């Protein structure tokens, strides 16, 4: 019988839970770490989140909520350091984490949970020093990303592949967002199936919900707040602007829609809510140039990343949220949109096949041909009753994705990891 888990060290080297999602390297992983930590703390589990300090102005320790502390570790230059360069700073980061733990009595942490391969390298060392279970979440995997690269995207380096293979072999448990990710861990990385736990991410259903229980009425209110026309056909993209997310597919689809029906120009609005992460046309200025070349610059509205309450208003205002990513380990944007009552049109890749129920809460499209997206989006415009059915189905589906259920399952994974370590220490195989 495992002893209760009282304190967890969470490691997120390359992105801080305090960063605004949608900027730089901050995205769904940030939301995941914050939501899990808050809910663990509410259940009496203390969480220390170690992340790299990116400014000398940051305090050594910042309280996120009661029971959750963010610990900033100085390792390398504070600014102008790309994620691809962080592997060279892992020794300094690991040293900082080990020093922080050494300031406490032995056994201060009951478990390590690392996020992304860089953090896994740190956890791999700390696990040996502390004698505690290591649970690791990949969030994305190099072999999967390299098999589905977007045009203009850069392949993940060999050092990342090696790092992921090392943490796969060294972790006591691996957390997969979906059954497909679990299969990829086993088939591509040789993970032990018995050490892979599927934990579906959640949505904050108290925040992401139809306003006052209304679907169309809630959309009207949101559009007034955002200064959007009531009669617009609003297509929404949310996320970091990078090749992987393929926002250009939406712009090209919108151009095809207007070309096929010039009268649509009076009503079509494409909103892109997100910040730069990458280069070329995947940056806002690159997308703006593309919109001009396509002749739809007047239809596209670019908005910076925004706090979650405002983001929920964008979801409510939209007719459809479009997620044309080349790969997603889950697809938090799709889940949030559905929770607000807005159906999703998404690429049938990765975790999006779990996050969206095709034909019930949205539409999944094979491939990334803008013509296919234009056809689906045009049909949804022309069939408002179908949109309404999908909107209702989206809300129903999202209700199965609350964060509390995620934490319930994650605690089961933590317990399994502790049982494995305890059994190994006792010289017996875990049951």
Curated annotation (Swiss-Prot):
Protein name stated in the entry: D-inositol 3-phosphate glycosyltransferase
Keyword entries, A-Z: Glycosyltransferase, Magnesium, Metal-binding, Transferase
InterPro entries: Glyco_trans_1, Glyco_trans_4-like_N, Glycosyltransferase_grp1, Mycothiol_biosynthesis_MshA
Residue stretches spanning the membrane: none
Residues annotated to bind 1D-myo-inositol 3-phosphate: 14, 25-30, 83, 116, 140, 160
Similarity section: Belongs to the glycosyltransferase group 1 family. MshA subfamily.
Residues in coiled coil: none
Keyword set includes Phosphoprotein: no
Subunit: Homodimer.
Native source species: Thermomonospora curvata (strain ATCC 19995 / DSM 43183 / JCM 3096 / KCTC 9072 / NBRC 15933 / NCIMB 10081 / Henssen B9)
Substrates-to-products reaction catalysed: 1D-myo-inositol 3-phosphate + UDP-N-acetyl-alpha-D-glucosamine = 1D-myo-inositol 2-acetamido-2-deoxy-alpha-D-glucopyranoside 3-phosphate + UDP + H(+)
Binding site for Mg(2+): 315-316, 318, 342
Gene Ontology terms: biological process: mycothiol biosynthetic process
GO MF annotation list: acetylglucosaminyltransferase activity; D-inositol-3-phosphate glycosyltransferase activity; magnesium ion binding
Pfam families (alphabetical): Glyco_trans_4_4, Glycos_transf_1
Residues at which UDP-N-acetyl-alpha-D-glucosamine binds: 20-21, 28, 240, 245, 328, 336
Entry EC no(s): 2.4.1.250
Function description: Catalyzes the transfer of a N-acetyl-glucosamine moiety to 1D-myo-inositol 3-phosphate to produce 1D-myo-inositol 2-acetamido-2-deoxy-glucopyranoside 3-phosphate in the mycothiol biosynthesis pathway.
């Amino acid at each position: 019988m495992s002893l209760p888990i009282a304190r967890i060290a969470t490691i997120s080297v390359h992105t801080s839970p305090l960063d605004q999602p949608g900027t730089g390297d901050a995205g769904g992983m940030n939301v995941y770490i914050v939501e899990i930590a808050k809910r663990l703390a509410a259940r009496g589990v203390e969480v220390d989140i170690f992340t790299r300090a990116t400014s000398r102005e940051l305090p050594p320790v910042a309280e996120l909520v009661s029971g959750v502390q963010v610990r900033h570790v100085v390792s390398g230059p504070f600014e102008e350091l790309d994620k691809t360069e962080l592997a060279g700073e892992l020794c300094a980061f690991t040293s900082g984490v080990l020093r922080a733990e050494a300031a406490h009595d032995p056994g201060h942490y009951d478990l390590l949970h690392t996020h992304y391969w860089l953090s896994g390298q740190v956890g791999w060392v700390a696990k040996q020093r502390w004698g505690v279970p290591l649970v690791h979440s990949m969030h994305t995997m190099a072999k999967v990303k390299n098999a589905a690269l977007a045009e203009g995207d850069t392949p993940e380096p060999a050092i990342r592949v090696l790092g992921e293979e090392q943490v796969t072999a060294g972790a006591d448990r691996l957390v997969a967002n979906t059954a497909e990710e679990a299969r990829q861990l086993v088939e591509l990385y040789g993970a032990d199936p018995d050490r892979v736990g599927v934990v579906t991410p959640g949505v904050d259903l108290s925040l992401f919900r139809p306003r006052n229980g209304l679907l169309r009425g809630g959309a009207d209110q949101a559009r007034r707040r955002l200064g959007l026309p009531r009669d617009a056909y609003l297509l929404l993209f949310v996320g970091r602007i990078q090749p992987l997310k393929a926002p250009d597919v939406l712009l090209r689809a919108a151009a095809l829609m207007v070309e096929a029906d010039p009268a649509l120009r009076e009503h079509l609005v494409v909103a892109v809510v997100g910040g730069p992460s990458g280069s070329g046309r995947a940056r806002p200025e690159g997308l703006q140039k593309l919109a001009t070349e396509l002749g739809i610059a007047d239809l596209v509205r670019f908005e910076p990343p925004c706090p979650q309450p405002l983001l929920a208003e964008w979801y409510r205002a939209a007719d459809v949220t479009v997620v044309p990513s080349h790969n997603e380990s889950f697809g938090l944007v799709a889940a949030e949109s559905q929770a607000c009552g807005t159906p999703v049109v998404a690429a049938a890749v990765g975790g999006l096949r779990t996050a969206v129920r095709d034909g019930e809460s949205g539409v999944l499209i094979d491939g990334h041909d803008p013509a296919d997206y234009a056809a689906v989006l045009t049909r949804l415009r022309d069939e408002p009753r179908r949109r309404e059915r999908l909107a209702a189905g989206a809300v129903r589906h999202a209700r199965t994705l609350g964060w509390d259920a995620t934490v319930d399952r994650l605690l089961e994974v933590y317990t399994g990891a502790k049982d494995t370590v305890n059994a190994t220490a006792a010289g017996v195989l875990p049951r």
